[in-house]
């Protein structure tokens, strides 16, 4: 399968609607599965993308308006992103909201509110990722969030969303792996690219290990 993504325009839209014919052709002529990463996409465009055959939609969600405005620089609020998730669920699409822990320069704060907002929609899947300091950006000198902060958010999500599949996605710092087992214990159902040590520990804890070579939202 593949992840279909891209940069957003000043309004926060990831303009995937222009690729609807190509998506239809891919779905009609290949067995590939498609995960579309959308931003503040209007409902009409979402309808076209759903009808094109997209298998899963990934939507970043946030817990407060300040985080949206500082990090993304758009004139929108947290509820606008939750609204995209709601629209996709209403349209019968598979959707995997994503919460980035520490996205505000490594600082945490919005995440638990984001979990509560997602819990009201009870999606089948919720993905956690975490901030990675990136050279050339405003946050390049900021620290990655602590592992214990990521684990705390996962634990809260497990309590709030007992029937939702919780996954740890690919975008996270791999420098410190010591907290991965704690994340499993907190309630994760799956993890992208776990360390070998984490896999061995999970097996010892009684987890059934299933390897899948695909985007976690499609797994």
What are these regions (language model features)?
Residues 7-9, 37-41, 62-64, 100-104, ...:
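Active-site beta-loop-alpha junctions enriched in small/polar residues
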Residues 23-26, 34, 82, 89, ...:
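Weak global preference for isoleucine
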Residues 35-42, 70-75, 91-100, 131-137, ...:
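Low-complexity, flexible helical/coil segments
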């Amino acid at each position: 399968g593949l992840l279909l993504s891209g940069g957003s325009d000043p309004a926060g839209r990831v303009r995937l609607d222009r690729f609807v014919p190509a998506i239809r052709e891919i779905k009609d002529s290949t067995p590939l599965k498609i995960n579309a990463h959308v931003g503040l996409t209007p409902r009409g465009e979402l309808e076209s993308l759903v009808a094109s055959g997209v298998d899963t939609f990934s939507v970043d969600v946030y817990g407060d308006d300040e985080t949206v405005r500082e990090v993304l620089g758009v004139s929108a609020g947290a509820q606008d992103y939750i609204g995209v998730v709601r629209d996709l669920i209403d349209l019968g699409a598979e959707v995997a909201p994503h919460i980035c822990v520490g996205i505000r320069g490594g600082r945490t704060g919005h995440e638990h509110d984001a979990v509560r907002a997602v819990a009201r929609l009870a999606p089948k899947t919720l993905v956690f990722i975490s901030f990675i300091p990136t050279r050339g950006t405003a946050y390049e000198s900021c620290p990655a969030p602590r592992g214990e902060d990521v684990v705390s958010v996962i634990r809260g999500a497990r309590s709030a969303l007992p029937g939702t599949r919780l996954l740890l996605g690919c975008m996270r710092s791999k420098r410190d792996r010591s907290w991965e087992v704690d994340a499993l214990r907190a309630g994760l159902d799956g993890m992208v690219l776990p360390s070998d040590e984490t896999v061995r520990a999970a097996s010892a804890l009684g987890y059934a290990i299933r390897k899948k070579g695909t985007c976690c939202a499609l797994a």
